[in-house]
Amino acid sequence: ANQFQAYQATRYVDTSIPHIPVTAYGLKENGYATIATTNWLPYSWSINNVAFAEVMHTALSYFQAGRADAGYKLLKSSVLDGMYLGDSPGNFGQISFYDAARGVCFRDFGEPIGVASRVLIQGLFGILPDALNQQIILRPGFPDDWDKASVSTPDISYRFTRKENTDTYHITQRFQTPLHPVLHVNARKEKIRSVKVNGVPATWQSIESAHGYPLLSIQAEGTSSTTITIEWEVAPLHTLAVQEPVISSNGKLA
């Protein structure tokens, strides 16, 4: 699938898959919601559930489709559901208590734990090794209001900081042969003042298949330590609100 087809698939989830509000006493209302695996009825086991692994896979799909905001909201909703409000504090079970047929089942369940780890590394932090092509793609999926984040794995660490109009990414590799870091980031303002790699002016490219926001690609040489700095200027970019289509009784767009 291309990026727009991936976007369309996630829009199907938005409009056709049941969303269940995640609420609790003392939890600030912020649109948190988990999802069912399907809208299939009548109920049968393993066809229509509220299962943590499937929810996390869907969150990863949002990140992969370039919809990091929706991916993060679903990720956080599921973490609140399982780790804080469910019967597996600080961990994941198999099924959410929002599942009407089964409710909470099992504790410390390996399947959602593994998928949640993948969402964190490949989705939220966007670490995508591509050693066959001697590169490692970093496609951060941080919420817009984050001004710092960091992650450390056995093979790579990186730290993101934002100060006013400047975004900085410090990348440290521990591969036997360092890969070329390729940073993919959404344009957050109307103009780029400068891009630097290890303090030296660098070029950037626009990825044509992007949607929602312009997507920039910045490539660096494969070294054990890399610092990429992006300085923005002019006004912030904003996306248009999604307007749901109106379907007439004959099945055509009104």
State each model region's role:
Residues 1-50, 83-85, 94-98, 150:
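Extended glycan-interaction surfaces of carbohydrate-active proteins
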